């Protein structure tokens, strides 16, 4: 039994040496010819042949999906146009009374058409920043407006941050009303706006004309609720407007 085992070890050793010699001869031949066997790689660290491992495909990097809402997408493709509206009216309230109503941005949510929310954010160096929310189904948007004033003469509001408008500017001007009637004033209202998307423009065209046309009336009604209604002679008011 012992002799058999020794012969077995000797035979295995001889077989191993023969395989290694064959491998070396093959490698020397490959070096001379400059060819590489297909599907075979040489592991120099241990001197054995091994099948080439196929490269695993790299996992694809996560695709970056750019999210854009339909309204934002419509803007650069379709665009919109700037719209302007102005109105002048003689009112039965003094300059100071109407100025106080227009400058009271905090309470716009109470009486301004389609204004759902109004909140003053800051007031520095004569400039007030306010956040307004306007809603006309199905659109409800918030924007920040900067309001600057010339006391008893002008209130100017400009949209400075929002998704709804490319441009929104509102100007109110106050001047004397009927001659000899300090309890009257002339209110000039001007608004210009441009929506960021054509879709908003289409929605606005259905009703926004009525909104801006109701604006002066809304402020006049608010003044009536606070100060009491004051009538202005229509003929005198018409004559004053004609002179302007």
UniProtKB/Swiss-Prot annotation:
Q: Where in the cell is it found?
A: Mitochondrion inner membrane
Q: Which Gene3D superfamilies match?
A: 3.30.530.20
Q: What is its main location?
A: mitochondrion
Q: Name one GO biological process term.
A: cellular respiration
Topologically, how does it sit relative to the membrane? Peripheral membrane protein
**Disulfide bonding pattern of the chain:** none
**The entry's keywords:** Membrane, Mitochondrion, Mitochondrion inner membrane, Transit peptide
* InterPro entries named among the record's database cross-references: COQ10-like, COQ10_START, START-like_dom_sf
Which terms does the record give in the GO molecular function aspect?
ubiquinone binding
So what does this one do?
Required for the function of coenzyme Q in the respiratory chain. May serve as a chaperone or may be involved in the transport of Q6 from its site of synthesis to the catalytic sites of the respiratory complexes.
Report quaternary structure and partners.
Interacts with coenzyme Q.
Q: Which family is it part of?
A: Belongs to the COQ10 family.
Record-given protein name: Coenzyme Q-binding protein COQ10 homolog B, mitochondrial
């Amino acid at each position: 039994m012992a002799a058999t085992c020794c012969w077995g070890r000797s035979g295995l050793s001889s077989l191993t040496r023969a395989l290694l010699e064959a491998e070396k001869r093959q490698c020397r031949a490959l070096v001379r010819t400059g060819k590489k066997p297909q599907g075979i790689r040489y592991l120099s660290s241990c001197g054995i042949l091994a099948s080439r491992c196929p490269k695993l495909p790299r996992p694809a990097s996560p695709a970056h999906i750019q999210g854009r809402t339909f309204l934002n997408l419509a803007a650069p493709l379709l665009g919109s146009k700037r719209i302007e509206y102005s109105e002048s009216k003689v009112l039965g309230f003094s300059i100071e009374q109407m100025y106080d109503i227009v400058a009271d941005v905090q309470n716009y949510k109470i009486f301004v058409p389609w204004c759902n929310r109004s909140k003053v954010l800051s007031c520095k160096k004569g400039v007030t920043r306010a956040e307004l929310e306007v809603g006309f189904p199905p659109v409800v948007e918030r924007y920040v407006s900067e309001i600057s004033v010339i006391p008893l003469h002008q209130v100017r509001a400009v949209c400075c941050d929002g998704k709804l408008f490319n441009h929104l500017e509102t100007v109110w001007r106050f001047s004397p009303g009927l001659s000899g009637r300090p309890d009257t004033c002339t209110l000039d209202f001007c608004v210009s706006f441009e929506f960021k998307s054509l879709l908003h423009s289409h929605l606005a065209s259905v009703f926004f004309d009525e909104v801006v046309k109701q604006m002066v009336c809304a402020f006049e009604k608010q003044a009536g609720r606070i100060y009491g209604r004051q009538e202005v002679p229509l003929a005198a008011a018409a004559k004053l407007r004609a002179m302007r």
